[in-house]
Regions:
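Structured, contiguous alpha/beta core segments that scaffold functional sites
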Residues: 2, 6-14, 18-21, 146-318
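C-terminal anchoring/interaction modules
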Residues: 1-22, 30, 47, 304-540
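Alpha-helical structural motif
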Residues: 12, 26, 67, 72, ...
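Extended, helix-rich architectural segments
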Residues: 1-200
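Short, hydrophobic/amphipathic alpha-helical patches that form generic packing surfaces
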Residues: 70-78, 276-294, 457, 473-480
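Long, contiguous amphipathic alpha-helices that act as assembly "spine/axial" helices in icosahedral shell
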Residues: 101-146, 270-304, 338-371, 380-414
């Protein structure tokens, strides 16, 4: 590829990146606010405290949001990807093949689990970061890469600020433009043979290694191939030197993006997070927490914060104290309180907003998972069903956009590294399905289990009421009323087979009873014949 083609290709990708960035630009102010409120390093303000000498200290505002995010990640992990639970399996859709070769798929499935949760894997750490990003920003990008030395798939949740993305007509994200800024030294770790144009031209003859510490911008483009269906173009571009470092065609995309939810009236590929819906409440909580701390200071020490209130009243919108003049025995200004804050009301507001954040991020539900008090099996079933239904909207989307593609990508990468257990030759070209079976999905199925239990209780009561009820028709009616899954009911053919089996069993029972009667009659006749013979002998 000559320099003109390179420039043309780089210009095309730059234009495409700018277009995708314009779609993301509207979200950037919101992302900044979320980062400030969800990151404890940014959730500080400064107050003045008089204790002998006046010193500058930092006090933290309410950190409910930041502290709830790890708990939310734990909730999602326990319901979607728990380490101690086999949350997916692989099966052949053909029942005969599954019965004969299903154990080979089970070995493959077990291999994936062992690799994913081994000591060399960072899967759990990556998923924890992913769930927090999903809750805070509404979307995430997971990168899968190959560790050829250990034949291990590596996982990493990347910062969303590095990406602009686009989705296809089915609503799946399949286009990634990732921009990373670092030094050429970092770039050489990924591409050891690459040297930028200015180095090749001899710009650094006096100091041959000086260019390694210069900053550069790397653009990585991954998008569906325009020439081959099912393939992806992967292009690495040095935007500082305006050179294409590498251009390859890959059988898969190593990035996976998903969203918490999306706006139905827009075409934007970026997600809408649970925290976005309560962002005004979170901001108010931090403001009220500041007011509560300030009111507490005024109630305990009237001289505290007086300087802030008088010198910078615009920062707080009100003046709560005034200096009367003069100093006390310790050299502090005399202060009079103009308006005392209502601390119980402020405290109530803080608690209300804290509860709103916890409810939004399912934290209270996570705490109920840790409850140790005894409960009945029915109560436990209903509680598990409730948790599954609450998380279902977000969990179903994660399963569809993340977990299913991730498992397929894991299998493809392990196959490339020749690490998977081998299949039999008879299975070449056969198709198998990946079935998700995590605690969330099982909790949703408890609706049907509970309905089946209620149907059994009702049917038992009906049988005791009146003999005029037709039990078979009653079963059909109750199954329809309780919405029992058809999979647990007999089909018409199965019903006919059961009736035929019952009829045959009845006929066999009748034949056995008849045979018993005939045998008893023969025995009686035999006994009668013996008795008659004895009588004749006596008469003779």
């Amino acid at each position: 590829m000559n320099s003109y083609e390179n420039e043309e290709l780089i210009a095309r990708y730059s234009k495409r990146k700018q277009y995708l960035y314009s779609m993301k630009q509207n979200y950037l102010p919101i992302y900044q606010e979320l980062a400030i409120l969800g990151d404890p390093r940014n959730a500080y303000f400064t107050v003045r405290r008089s204790n002998g000498d006046i010193s500058q200290v930092t006090a933290k505002t309410d950190d409910t949001l930041q502290s709830c995010l790890p708990l939310h990640a734990a909730v999602m992990n326990s319901l979607l990807t728990p380490a101690a639970y086999r949350w997916h399996s692989m099966v052949f859709p053909d029942n005969e093949i599954q019965e004969q070769y299903g154990d080979q798929l089970a070995f493959q499935n077990e291999f994936i689990y062992k690799k994913r949760y081994s000591s060399l894997s960072n899967f759990t750490c990556a998923m924890n970061t992913l769930y927090m990003s999903n809750a805070l920003y509404g979307w995430y990008v997971l990168e899968l890469s190959k560790d050829l030395k250990h034949k291990q798939v590596c996982y990493r949740t990347l910062p969303i600020k590095e990406f602009v993305i686009d989705q296809n007509e089915r609503g799946f994200v399949d286009t990634f433009y990732r921009t990373v800024k670092f030094t050429y030294r970092n770039l050489r770790q990924r591409f050891p043979k690459y040297m930028p144009k200015k180095v090749r031209e001899g710009t650094y003859q006096d100091n041959p290694y000086a260019w390694l510490d210069e900053n550069m911008e790397l653009l990585h483009v991954v998008e569906p191939s325009l020439t081959k269906a099912g393939k992806y173009d992967s292009i690495y571009i040095d935007m500082t030197s305006r050179e294409i470092i590498q251009k390859t065609e890959e059988p898969y995309c190593k990035y996976i993006a998903g969203r918490a939810s999306t706006f139905s009236n827009t075409n934007d590929p970026y997600g809408f997070s649970p925290v976005m819906s309560i962002l005004p409440s979170v901001k108010n909580l931090n403001a009220v927490a500041f007011d509560l701390i300030k009111a507490t200071h005024h109630a305990s020490r009237l001289d505290l914060l007086a300087g802030d209130d008088i010198i910078n009243p615009r920062n707080y919108q009100d003046v709560t104290s005034v200096i009367n003049g003069g100093m006390d025995s310790e050299g502090r200004p005399q202060v009079s309180v103009l308006a005392q804050r209502d601390m119980p009301t402020l405290d109530y507001m803080v608690q209300a907003w804290q509860k709103k954040i916890k409810d939004t991020l399912f934290v209270d539900m996570f705490m109920s998972l840790q409850e140790t008090q005894s409960r009945s099996a029915t109560d436990a079933m209903l509680k598990a069903n409730e948790r599954a239904n609450i998380v279902a909207p977000m969990g179903d989307r994660i399963a569809r956009e993340l977990l299913q593609p991730m498992i397929e990508l894991e299998l493809a990468m392990y196959a490339e590294m020749n690490a998977l257990p081998q299949f039999s030759k008879e299975l070449k070209g056969k198709v198998f399905d990946i079935v998700l079976d995590n605690p969330m999905l099982r909790g949703q199925r408890l609706d049907s289990a509970n309905a089946l239990l209620n149907m059994g209780n009702t049917l038992a009561q009906v049988q005791q009421m009146d003999t005029e009820f037709n039990i078979d028709r009653t079963k059909i009616y109750l199954a329809s009323a309780y919405n029992i899954p058809q999979t647990v009911l007999n089909t018409e053919d199965e019903k006919s087979a059961i009736v035929a089996a019952k009829q045959q069993q009845a006929q066999e029972q009748m034949m056995m009873e008849n045979a018993g009667g005939i045998g008893s009659g023969i025995k009686n006749l035999t006994d009668a014949g013996v008795n008659m013979e004895s009588l004749n002998q006596q008469q003779a």
